[in-house]
Amino acid sequence: MLAYIIRRMLILIPTLIGVSLIVFTMLHLTPGDPAELLLGERATDEALHQVREHLGLNEPLYVQYGMFVKRLMKGDLGETIRTRQKVWTEIKQRFPATMELSLVALMISCVMGIILGIISATKQYSIFDYLSMLGALIGVSMPIFWLGLVFMLIFSLNLGWLPISGRLSTDVDLSIVTNFYILDAILTGNWAAFKDAVWHIIMPAITLSTIPTAIVARMTRSAMLEVLRQDYIKTAKAKGLSRFKVVFKHALRNAMIPVITTIGLQFGVLLCGAILTETIFAWPGMGKWMYDAVMQRDYMVIQGGTLFISTLFILINLVVDLLYAVINPRISVQ
């Protein structure tokens, strides 16, 4: 197990080098001048030259990339062009908001997707099965930005049930402990802030969870149907075990292996897909931060944010692989 983890961590190094090289190359091939965006169109040539010199933009591309890698080896992701703050500092400030949104969306996806998949598998070809799989197909095909706008129109503007944007109302005070607002409200016993934070996260979390819920439901149904056809399930039924024990004790545990793979991948997708959701709902997380960076050609933010999310995605996949042995002891890590 330990040797496997070490090998996977070593693979992380060339993967991140490849990601950084691709992102660096693509950013420098796109039109636009970060110095001009920073100073404005009326900036003098001398001022532009000074900014380019300070940012190292006058150097050849291979020199700029070498400077970036050298800083990266020291744990320095550089400074943002817009605010002049350290990229790592900005990530630490904004990542909890994205993580909180992604975790809530993942919880919704897991609960709803697995329940729908189990019921559809145990009631194959029933009306519920057809309707749930039709809903899953629609969910997979649904554009997130369109769904988010529809939710805002219905539940915020027309009905006034849910707040339209942000993480917390301006008139609600909350003592920050972890920067996860829901958790902070629980830790400090601030139930007014807890209610407000939950109220704010409902719409963006449901919007973000739509596609993963549909994918998890389809995968759970497919895996359950395959397991329910196995001989040991028929034997369990012949022994007189209750339907509940057959489904949840014997079938579900073996069906969860591909489902966990799907959930792990979807968690990574949620972190990336949060860009659209955060932009629509003005959620102050990494997604909106990176979107603004793309619009303003802030190289350091895009590179640092992409590397951070890529590292997280790889680590999530490693955790998913290790969970296989926990769920099914017959599987050994090779």
Report the location of each language-model feature.
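Alpha-helical transmembrane segments of integral membrane proteins
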Residues: L2-A3, F95-P96, E100-F128, I144, ...
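N-terminal signal-anchor/signal peptide hydrophobic helix marking the start
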Residues: I6-L16
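Hydrophobic alpha-helical segments of integral membrane proteins
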Residues: M9, V51, L61-L77, V87, ...
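Hydrophobic alpha-helical transmembrane segments of membrane transport/permease proteins
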Residues: T15-G66, F155-A193
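Transmembrane helix irregularities
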Residues: T30, G139-M142, L271
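An internal, D/E-rich "acidic patch" concept
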Residues: N58-I114
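Pore- or pathway-lining transmembrane helices of multi-pass membrane proteins that form conduits
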Residues: D129-F155
